[in-house]
Curated annotation (Swiss-Prot):
Molecular function in Gene Ontology: 8-amino-7-oxononanoate synthase activity; pyridoxal phosphate binding
InterPro entries hit by this protein: Aminotrans_II_pyridoxalP_BS, Aminotransferase_I/II_large, AON_synthase_class-II, PyrdxlP-dep_Trfase, PyrdxlP-dep_Trfase_major, PyrdxlP-dep_Trfase_small
PANTHER family: 8-AMINO-7-OXONONANOATE SYNTHASE, CLASS II AMINOTRANSFERASE/8-AMINO-7-OXONONANOATE SYNTHASE
Entry EC number(s): 2.3.1.47
N6-(pyridoxal phosphate)lysine sites (modified residues): 235
Cofactor(s) the protein requires to work: pyridoxal 5'-phosphate
Pathway: Cofactor biosynthesis; biotin biosynthesis
Function: Catalyzes the decarboxylative condensation of pimeloyl-[acyl-carrier protein] and L-alanine to produce 8-amino-7-oxononanoate (AON), [acyl-carrier protein], and carbon dioxide.
Family, per entry: Belongs to the class-II pyridoxal-phosphate-dependent aminotransferase family. BioF subfamily.
Keywords linked to the UniProt accession: Acyltransferase, Biotin biosynthesis, Pyridoxal phosphate, Transferase
Name of this chain's protein: 8-amino-7-oxononanoate synthase
Keyword Kinase listed: no
Originating organism: Methylobacterium sp. (strain 4-46)
Subunit structure and binding partners: Homodimer.
Amino acid sequence: MPVPPTLSLDAFAAAKLAGLDAAGLRRRLVPTARTGGARAERDGRAVVSFSCNDYLGLATHPEVVAAAHAALDRYGAGSGGSRLVTGSHPILAELEAALAARKGHEAALVFGSGYLANLGVTPALVGAGDLILIDELGHSCMWAGTRLAGARALPFRHNDLGHLEDLLARERARARRALILTERVFSMDGDRAPVAEILGLARAFDAWTLVDDAHGLGVVGPDATAPLEMGTLSKALGSYGGYLCASRPVIDLLTSRARSFVYTTGLPPASAAAALAALRLIEAEPARAARPLALARRFTARLGLPEAQSAVVPVLVGEAEAALALSRALEARGFLVVAIRPPTVPPGTARLRVAFSAAHEEAEVDALAQALLDLGAAA
């Protein structure tokens, strides 16, 4: 008698989960409530969080929260439709204009998330017969968009300008169009791409460049501006959503061609209003933006690590189980520093990803550094 489909599906899932358990790679949801500043309650335990991407502490800023409340009261909870039907509410137009101005571009387009932005932009611009050159450590959503595009895709070694130039010299003439993908700040390593130099190579070989600025906006100082500047509203801006800034013709094309924009509901008014308020605070309070990097550098100096380039500092551990054990030991001491394991990072490079916020106190940073030293996790 054949096995009912639901039973075979459950058996498949159970076998896969057993494999993940054996490798220390199973993921679990843990209830976590932010309680003010950099503090949180994690599964009932009070902790200082060093795993939150709210780099400027704006998610709970009174002006940001008030803007979200006002939009909620005026426009309701949801946008009511896709952007091309009824979901393009007035706050989105304001937000897009502010993002474009911040990035020095003519226009911007807000997506449902940063992941959706990368998922939609690349396939809308390149396809079969074209070439994509992507940094090997590019975010998962950059790779997902690359695969959807159907173009020939070649990774270049991380931040290796020589390798990128070699690939362009060898492959560019075979393709109609070429697109280079990189991140301004790499999310798991915290290092920065040589954007100006990449743009120079792009000009020399008639290639376009998309820079993912998800972890840079509002945290690291401006550098060269790419023709395609993508980012998120969920990190330094403390809200939710994604965006692309570009020329007006490119934005107009994406409005019609980016499937992850066309076929999804518009961002809720409250999320857009919160992001807009946060963006205005960043413009008005430049000192706030300098604090996460300063704290990150204080931390790396105390641990003898290479000087931080961003608000993200990796503490490399190696194997997944060891990273999990170190994370648990820190949590027992009152610090939330989540272990990052494959496939998010390459095998053998499991780590603690330490994220710094303007909401952290220097004493909290020093205490975390000392805890890591006490646990033998740093030099």
